[in-house]
């Protein structure tokens, strides 16, 4: 993939600064949940957090046999506690019940009110190969129900303890649409949480015959930016959201919809790239990137050196209209 020149260095595999085994990137004491965590990019990211020493890694997906196989492999390799939950993120009630069950289980084990620390929003569906107006309505609907609405369902379930305390943001000074929200006396838990959205280069680059995937992923990433501005109103800004393109990773899901000749003609990035980058992005060192869309390929040390640019331009590396 052609480099968008944000950093001079464009990585295709892991490197020391994002190494999950580095003490600087430790996930010790953390509980991490990954949607679509049993295969492809999600599995690579789950593996990264196991490498980084996370206490518990929770895999969420639709097929139990795939979840069981992935969990067994991760536990055998790293000794990490791995939980699995079958859930269809398109089902809001089921997704909320799943996270309620996770919170209950974590709290029972520790005797305190516990929750997931890092949520990786990765599950997605890819429909491609047709012109825009040739997709059947059910295919259009499925793309948005998974890639956009499904992601909202997951984050709503994850942030259930925080939601009552999030104030409404006025459209204009003194103007708020909808019902008034009463938050007086409502206290947010204050637990530090991180949301990592696995976004895509196709949110801002036109790829032929990928209109549905591109549009639904774009909608998701843009909604996450709105959400960051809303939850920043909580005291202490306890939740940060990062959207990132994981690199060009050859996955079984992509192979299912792409011809073998096309797959073999492309220069792919190594799964170790998103594996390490996601772990680094969850650390305090990456806090200045919250609300932005970044590439896993970009060099993190060069990004850190650009911190002042991010502070001076709140729209830098966001999806917006620049004139």
Label each residue range with its predicted role.
Residues 1-31, 161, 167-177, 305-323:
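Non-catalytic terminal and boundary segments that flank Rossmann-like NAD(P)-dependent oxidoreductase
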Residues 8-9, 13-14, 243-244, 260-323:
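C-terminal helical subdomain
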Residues 38-39:
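Conserved glycine-rich cofactor-binding loop
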Residues 54-70:
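Conserved glycine-rich Rossmann-like NAD(P)H-binding loop of the short-chain dehydrogenase/reductase
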Residues 76-93:
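Rossmann-fold cofactor-recognition segment
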Residues 117, 125, 133-152, 170-176, ...:
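Catalytic Tyr-X3-Lys loop
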Residues 155-156, 225:
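A short, exposed helix-loop element centered on a Lys and neighboring polar residues
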Residues 163-180, 184-237, 247-249, 255:
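Catalytic loop of short-chain dehydrogenase/reductase
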């Amino acid at each position: 993939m052609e480099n968008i020149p944000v950093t001079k260095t464009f990585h295709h595999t892991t490197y020391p600064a994002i190494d999950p085994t580095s003490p600087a990137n430790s996930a010790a004491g953390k509980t991490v949940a990954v949607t679509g965590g049993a295969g492809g990019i999600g599995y690579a990211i789950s593996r990264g957090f196991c490498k980084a020493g996370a206490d518990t890694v929770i895999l969420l997906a639709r097929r139990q046999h795939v979840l069981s196989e992935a969990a067994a492999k991760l536990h055998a390799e790293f000794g990490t506690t791995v939980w699995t939950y079958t859930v269809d993120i398109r089902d809001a009630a089921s997704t909320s019940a799943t996270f309620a069950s996770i919170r209950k289980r974590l709290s029972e084990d520790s005797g305190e009110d516990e929750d997931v620390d890092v949520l990786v929003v990765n599950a997605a569906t890819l429909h491609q190969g047709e012109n825009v107006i040739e997709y059947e309505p059910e295919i259009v609907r499925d793309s948005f129900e998974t890639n956009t609405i499904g992601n909202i369902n997951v984050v709503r379930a994850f942030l259930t303890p925080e939601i009552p305390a999030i104030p409404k943001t006025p459209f204009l000074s003194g103007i708020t649409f909808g019902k008034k929200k009463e938050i007086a006396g409502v206290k947010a838990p204050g637990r530090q949480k991180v949301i990592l959205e696995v976004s895509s280069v196709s949110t801002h680059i036109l790829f032929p015959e990928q209109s549905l995937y591109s549009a639904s992923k774009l909608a998701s990433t843009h909604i996450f930016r709105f959400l960051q501005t809303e939850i920043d109103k909580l005291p202490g800004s306890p939740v940060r959201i990062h959207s990132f393109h994981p690199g060009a990773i050859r996955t079984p899901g992509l192979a299912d919809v792409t011809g073998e000749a096309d797959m073999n003609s492309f220069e792919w990035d190594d799964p170790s790239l998103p594996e390490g980058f996601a772990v680094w992005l969850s650390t305090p060192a990456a806090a200045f990137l919250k609300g932005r869309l970044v590439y896993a390929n970009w060099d993190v040390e060069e990004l850190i050196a650009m911190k002042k640019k991010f502070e001076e331009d709140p729209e830098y590396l966001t999806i917006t209209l620049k004139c």
